[in-house]
UniProtKB/Swiss-Prot annotation:
Keywords: Coiled coil, DNA recombination. Transmembrane segments: none annotated. Signal peptide: none annotated. This is DNA recombination protein RmuC homolog. Belongs to the RmuC family. The keyword Transport does not apply.
Length: 411
């Protein structure tokens, strides 16, 4: 496909070049024909003059002069025509070169772009093939891990541990840190009950989360899925959590417990089979939660902590503002003292200058008129006219602090 395009461009360039040469040749032939006509006309006139010279010897010199001038004019005309033709063909050649040069450059650029595209396309095909191979390998690995996970979840102990791991992953996604934002496997003060996760809330409060994976062997059955026992296990666990009454053992907790189901499919299947589960759980102070709803709740708690920290920072800024205000009051007082001292110093300097000008300087001028003085003349001191700028008013610290405290009470 590239070769026909290149040949077409080259044929087009050749046609343009030969068309220009043909036009130039036509113009040159036309000028040559006009030149020959002029030569013939001049030769005819020359014949007439020769005939006239034969009739009159008196005009021989004139005819000779005219012939010489005619020869010179013809030579000059031929020379001018030759130079004009050379210049014209030279300009035409340059013009064609300027026309063909961009075309050649465009063809070269197009060829380079095409080669680059083919190289890149080959590289992309290689990378795509490699990625497809990796994807197939990952798919096989995922299929193997799915079978392994299915075998593991058939054991009750593994199912419980899987639920706890899923809960910890949700906590990590929410940006919470263990022992900082939450505690795991915390025992109550009486030591009788142990909560899976306790989330710390602002104002020394907490939220209790219990992870449950109510999965039976029939849940993984491929031939005939019977998920009726899923609802029974969830109802049984709701009764267990109600009997434990975590909110009474952990006094800073709200009067409910979050029952975390570690899978959107578990939550959806349970609600689809028994929509009354939400109402049953709420009446028992147990809130059912899927991974997504729990993540949204944890994000909300993180936002509450952010607002709590922001409020503490605002209070700290308020205290720092009060302290800064007191310290600035002291600084402003020192500034005022410095200004007063500067003004007193300037006033004393001006008084000394005035005394020197009117009492001491006249006597010194008399000394300068005598031979006993030196050749140097004592310069007259210049008084200072500007004074130190004072603050427009004194900062009333008690009034300003009272205003700040009143605004804080309103907030």
């Amino acid at each position: 496909m590239n070769l026909p395009v290149s040949l077409a461009c080259l044929l087009l360039s050749g046609c343009v070049f030969f068309l220009g040469v043909f036009v130039s040749s036509s113009l040159y032939a036309r000028k040559k024909r006009a030149f020959l006509e002029k030569i013939q006309k001049l030769e005819h006139e020359n014949q007439l003059l020769q005939t006239s010279l034969n009739l009159s010897r008196h005009q021989e010199q004139l005819i000779e002069d005219f012939s010489n001038r005619l020869a010179l004019s013809s030579h000059k005309l031929i020379k001018d025509m030759k130079e004009e033709a050379q210049n014209y063909f030279g300009d035409t050649s340059k013009s064609f070169q300027s026309i063909l040069s961009p075309i050649q450059t465009t063809l070269t650029t197009f060829k380079q772009s095409l080669e680059t595209f083919e190289t890149k396309h080959a590289e992309d095909r290689g990378r795509l093939k490699e990625q497809i191979s990796q994807l197939l390998a990952v798919e096989k690995k995922l299929e193997h891990e799915t079978h392994v996970l299915t075998d593991i979840l058939k054991h009750p102990g593994s199912r419980g541990r899987w639920g706890e791991i899923q809960l910890e992953r949700i906590l990590e996604l929410a940006g919470m840190l263990k022992y900082c934002d939450y505690d795991s496997q915390t025992t109550s003060a009486q030591g009788a009950f142990r909560a899976d996760i306790i989330i710390r809330l602002p104002q020394d409060r907490c939220l209790i989360i219990d992870a449950k994976a109510p999965i039976s062997d029939s849940y993984f059955s491929v031939e005939e899925i019977d998920k009726g026992d899923l609802v029974d296990k969830i109802k049984e666990h709701i009764k267990t959590l109600k009997s434990k009454s975590y909110w009474e053992k952990f006094h800073q907790s709200p009067e409910y417990v979050i029952l975390f189901l570690p899978g959107e499919s578990l939550f959806n299947d349970a609600i689809r089979l028994a929509p009354e589960l939400m109402e049953i759980g709420a009446s028992s102070n147990v809130i059912l939660s899927s991974p997504l709803t729990l993540l949204a709740l944890l994000k909300t708690i993180a936002y509450m902590w952010k607002q709590e920290n922001l409020q503490k920072q605002i209070q700290e800024v308020s205290l720092l503002g009060k302290e800064l205000h007191r310290r600035l009051q002291v600084v402003f007082t020192h500034f005022q003292k410095i200004g007063k001292n500067l003004n007193q110093t300037v006033q004393s300097y001006n008084d000394m200058t005035s005394s020197f000008q009117y009492r001491v300087l006249p006597t010194l001028r008399k000394f300068e008129g005598l031979e006993t003085s030196s050749s140097h003349q004592i310069e007259e001191p210049t008084p200072i006219e500007s004074l130190a700028t004072s603050f427009p008013h004194t900062c009333d610290i008690d009034t300003n602090l009272a205003v700040i405290e009143s605004l804080e009470k309103q907030d």
